[in-house]
């Protein structure tokens, strides 16, 4: 297929976004001779590995084999849902080998690597998922060594676990930890989601929304500075101000903790002097960018009413009816949010979140689709 237009490389960087959009539009509208669209799974900007994989499955005749090496984000990212559906519902996805980013399977490639094996035509009933794998488990005789960790995903349970998105959970290597993750998934899969208006906390009929912090740290950098006692400005909360101490998550900011060392990173970029004002009420916030090596992924904390939030922090926009319900039950909105934060920081929900995480960003979609059981339904995961 020849794409129309002038695709000269002599363009300024400001034009690249428009070029990508035009390329995406043309590829999405590319049709076969019978009028059907050639690519059914393209969403947003063109992603070459998705395009190559879909085209490969089209070109190989039924019962032929397709093997491809792609980023392992395909297993869980939202934008790959249409491609996973095609692999499951119209083809036989037989195996996947997942190598996490720390294995450095290819020199210079820092992201995780996934090896897919697909038989074209038919549909998938069972897929054997190997991982997390180590580079030393690759075998020149059999592909993988016999003791490589794996799990079999069967269609009935897989459908329930993912609500038809066909994501593949990220599993730990340790057998005991794997059982804990599977137990958490099985216990939570049928629970209502946080953003569903039918959940136990929300009688309003209005969904709980997840919002990104109001201050873009790049665009407003001139209005963000080091915290200085007595200086003009209000507290600026970003991801680094979330502190974990045991099982407790709290905000560690010099405006609320005078013992923070003068050289501490919590003091840098901690003061806001721009025109956007604090919301005037406490909020329940979650760190949006996490270190993959941390034991915990979900880090919820209540932020005070006199601060603003950076875009490395997400927060819940709760309907008035939910806030009133929390205040009535716990004495105040602030105390109610503290109770809710402890619930959302439960071990069970964190196991779920780590299993389905696509990357190091805790995005709005992930939080909105988080299972939301009642507190009495949360229990310790042990095997």
Segments the model singles out, each with a brief description of its role:
Residues 1-7, 11:
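Single conserved hydrophobic/aromatic residue that forms the stacking wall/gate
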Residues 9-28:
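Flexible glycine-rich, low-complexity coil/linker segments exposed to the extracellular/periplasmic environment
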Residues 26-41:
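Short glycine/proline-rich turn/loop motifs
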Residues 37, 46, 50-53, 57-60, ...:
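Polybasic, glycine- and aromatic-enriched phosphate-binding surface used to engage nucleic acids
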Residues 70-75, 102:
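Conserved short loop/turn motifs at secondary-structure junctions
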Residues 74-82, 379-381:
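Catalytic palm subdomain of template-directed nucleic-acid polymerases
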Residues 79-96:
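Conserved Class I S-adenosyl-L-methionine
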Residues 129-131, 142:
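Trafficking entry modules
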